[in-house]
């Protein structure tokens, strides 16, 4: 990984998968210039989801969130690029789709907060934790994109 790059964890939730939005979401990250370094299609276990959402365990919506995330397959991904955590969050839109601007993923494709189709790390530290939870180090593929010099100075 280049010195000025960081990585983020992005997961397309079961509703995003069921609605056929996987390709559109990947396309947006690729077109922005970010590099995909890992991806898997998984039915996340309840234990994995409880670890992933441990910070929310005392919130009233926690049981429903774990059930929803366990209701179908998820596309788990790691993206790399300059300021990818912050920029990725902007691309996703607000957690509540009603507050998301048109042009964002949630602004374009979501209506309710309980079905907001995508998760993105909220900090570099969270990204590192989430990546290590969902992926083994050997699953992160390091390569140089032929588009790199056309995206970065």
Swiss-Prot record:
The active site is at 119 (pros-phosphohistidine intermediate). GO terms for cellular component: extracellular space; lamellipodium; mitochondrion; plasma membrane; ruffle. This is Nucleoside diphosphate kinase. GO terms for biological process: CTP biosynthetic process; GTP biosynthetic process; negative regulation of apoptotic process; positive regulation of epithelial cell proliferation; positive regulation of keratinocyte differentiation; regulation of apoptotic process; regulation of epidermis development; UTP biosynthetic process. Its EC number is 2.7.4.6. The keyword Oxidoreductase does not apply. It holds the Pfam family NDK. It comes from the Eukaryota. Disulfide bonds: none annotated. It catalyses: a 2'-deoxyribonucleoside 5'-diphosphate + ATP = a 2'-deoxyribonucleoside 5'-triphosphate + ADP; a ribonucleoside 5'-diphosphate + ATP = a ribonucleoside 5'-triphosphate + ADP.
């Amino acid at each position: 990984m280049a010195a000025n790059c960081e990585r983020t964890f992005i997961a397309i939730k079961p509703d995003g998968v069921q609605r056929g939005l996987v390709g559109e979401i990947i396309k947006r990250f690729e077109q922005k210039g970010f590099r995909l370094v890992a991806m898997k299609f998984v039915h996340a276990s309840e234990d994995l989801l409880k670890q992933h959402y441990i910070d929310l365990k005392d919130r009233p919506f926690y049981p429903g969130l774990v059930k929803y995330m366990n209701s179908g397959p998820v596309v788990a991904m790691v993206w790399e690029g300059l300021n990818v955590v912050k920029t990725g969050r902007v691309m996703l839109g607000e957690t509540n789709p009603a507050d998301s601007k048109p042009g964002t993923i949630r602004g374009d494709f979501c209506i309710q907060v309980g079905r907001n189709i995508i998760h993105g790390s909220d900090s570099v530290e969270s990204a590192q934790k989430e990546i290590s939870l969902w992926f083994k180090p050997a699953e992160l593929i390091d390569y140089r994109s032929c588009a790199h010099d056309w995206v970065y100075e």
